[in-house]
Every structure is written in C-alpha cells, then in structure tokens.
C-alpha cells in the first residue's frame, strides 16, 4: 500500500515511484511542479492528491493516509475530515465515485467553473469533453444559475452535465446540456 501524507487540504505521496504508480492507475493527482504530464513516465516528482481523490483511493485500499501526528486515517476518518473542509463534500464525493466506477477520469473542474472536468481517455491525451456540476437533487437551481453553468461550458467547448445526487438512495442521475444553433 502506498504511503501518503495529509497536509492541510491536500495529500502528498513523497515517493516518486509510488507517485508514478498511483498516477498510472487512473491519472490521479498532480506531480508537484509539472503542469501537463503526457503520461506516467513524466511523473518525476512527488504527487499531490485532492482530498476527494485521497478518500477514493483510501477506500480502494491503494493508499494509506498518515496525518501530522503519525496516525493512519482509515477511509471513514479521512471522509469525515474531508467533510469538514470541503463544502458539499458528500455530494461531490458521491459523484466522483460514481464517475470513477463508470470508468471516467475525473479531475478538478475549478478552472472551468465546475466541480469536475471529466475525461474518457485522460488528461494529456484529450481535452476534457465534459464539465460536471454536482447538485443535491432536493435543492432548487435558479434559471440564472443554470445559465451561468451553461455559459462556462459553452465558452470552453465542453458539454455541461448536472449530476443530481439523491442522498436517500445514494443514487446519481445525470442531465447533459448541449448548445445548438437554430
């Protein structure tokens, strides 16, 4: 199991060989100081994982997260810690996990004004065809919010997907929007 260190809102894998291994198994994380690796061979520095990625990898048994006191944070504790730091973590994690289980590569979508950028092949191999916004199915979305979501996806030439999470059933439904010329 790969050793990872919890540092605030990030998790670091200091060993480069272990970083390369984790990256090669699904494009997880970002190598520190390397902006756009083309593949695992370009991972020559420690890897930085988001909390969402870390919780997922801990649940899968691929990483062991250790806090500053040397305590190992099992999946449940890491999930609880992440929930305190990230707004709507439960909703976002449920969508992340669902997309990963469906075989997609899921990265942060912050630069696109979304929760996630989603790839079918992976970063460096294609541009992300989708941006995903995670939403609680019981929350209302205003027309203004919907328009602003759509503008971002249109200006970046990506398809907008709303991921609707039902907390009761833990199911996720997806609605995709596409711009058309008329």
From Swiss-Prot:
This is tRNA-splicing endonuclease. CDD domains: tRNA-intron_lyase_C. Endonuclease that removes tRNA introns. Cleaves pre-tRNA at the 5'- and 3'-splice sites to release the intron. The products are an intron and two tRNA half-molecules bearing 2',3' cyclic phosphate and 5'-OH termini. Recognizes a pseudosymmetric substrate in which 2 bulged loops of 3 bases are separated by a stem of 4 bp. Keywords: Lyase, tRNA processing. The active site is at 119, 127, 158. Pfam families: tRNA_int_endo, tRNA_int_endo_N. Belongs to the tRNA-intron endonuclease family. Archaeal short subfamily. Its EC number is 4.6.1.16. GO terms for molecular function: lyase activity; nucleic acid binding; tRNA-intron endonuclease activity. It catalyses: pretRNA = a 3'-half-tRNA molecule with a 5'-OH end + a 5'-half-tRNA molecule with a 2',3'-cyclic phosphate end + an intron with a 2',3'-cyclic phosphate and a 5'-hydroxyl terminus. GO terms for biological process: tRNA splicing, via endonucleolytic cleavage and ligation. It comes from the Archaea. GO terms for cellular component: cytoplasm. Homotetramer; although the tetramer contains four active sites, only two participate in the cleavage. Therefore, it should be considered as a dimer of dimers. The gene is endA. HAMAP family: EndA_short. Transmembrane segments: none annotated. It comes from Saccharolobus islandicus (strain M.16.27) (Sulfolobus islandicus).
